[in-house]
C-alpha cells in the first residue's frame, strides 16, 4: 500500500507535467505551493496579495483539471504557502482558505495544509503560536490536516516542531 508524493510549484506547465509523470500510479499526493511572503511578493513577483492568492487558486484548479484526466488514480492534495513565516498570519489563512474552497476537502478526503518555516525568522514559540492560531481559525478545519514544516536555519527546528505539534 504505497502512496507517491510529488512537489510542484503553482505553475500550470509544471503541474501538467507532474500529473503526466504520475499517470498510472494508484495513489498520489500532489503537494503544490507558491510563495506568499511579504518580501517575495514585493521583490520576486512584484505582485499584490490578490495576484499571489490567484496563483494559489489557479494552481488548485489546475490540479483538479489534471486529476480529471487520470480517473484511475486516487489523488490527494497538499498546499503550502511557501515562506509562511514571512507572511502575515491573516493573509496566510486567507490564501489557505481560498485553496481549500477550490479543492473542497471533506473529513474523508482532507486537504493537507503544510505551514513551512521556509526561513526560520523567529523563536520556536512564535511559530507554535502561529500554528495554534491557524488551527483555530482555518475554514473547513474538520477537513484539513495541518502539516508542520520547520527548517533549521537557526538550529531550532526540533523545538519548533515539538511546540507546533503541542499547539495545533
What are these language model-derived features?
Residues 12-144, 160-162, 166-167:
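Alpha/beta enzyme core
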Residues 7, 31-35, 149:
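Short beta-strand segments
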Residues 1-12:
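N-terminal capping/small domains of soluble enzymes
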Residues 150-156:
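Active-site-adjacent loop and "lid" segments of alpha/beta metabolic enzymes
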Amino acid at each position: 500500500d504505497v502512496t507517491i508524493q510529488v512537489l510542484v510549484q503553482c505553475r500550470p506547465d509544471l503541474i501538467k507535467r507532474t500529473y503526466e509523470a504520475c499517470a498510472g500510479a494508484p495513489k498520489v499526493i500532489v503537494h503544490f505551493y507558491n510563495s506568499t511572503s511579504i518580501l517575495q511578493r514585493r521583490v520576486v513577483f512584484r505582485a499584490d496579495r490578490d495576484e499571489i492568492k490567484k496563483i494559489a487558486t489557479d494552481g488548485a484548479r489546475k490540479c483538479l483539471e489534471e486529476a480529471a484526466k487520470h480517473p484511475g488514480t486516487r489523488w490527494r492534495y497538499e498546499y503550502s504557502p511557501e515562506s509562511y513565516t514571512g507572511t502575515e498570519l491573516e493573509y496566510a489563512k486567507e490564501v489557505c482558505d481560498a485553496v481549500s474552497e477550490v479543492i473542497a476537502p471533506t473529513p474523508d478526503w482532507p486537504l493537507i495544509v503544510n505551514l513551512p518555516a521556509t526561513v526560520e525568522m523567529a523563536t520556536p514559540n512564535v511559530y507554535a503560536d502561529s500554528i495554534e492560531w491557524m488551527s483555530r481559525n482555518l475554514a473547513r478545519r474538520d477537513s484539513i490536516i495541518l502539516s508542520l514544516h520547520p527548517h533549521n536555519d537557526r538550529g531550532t527546528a526540533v523545538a519548533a516542531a515539538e511546540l507546533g505539534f503541542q499547539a495545533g
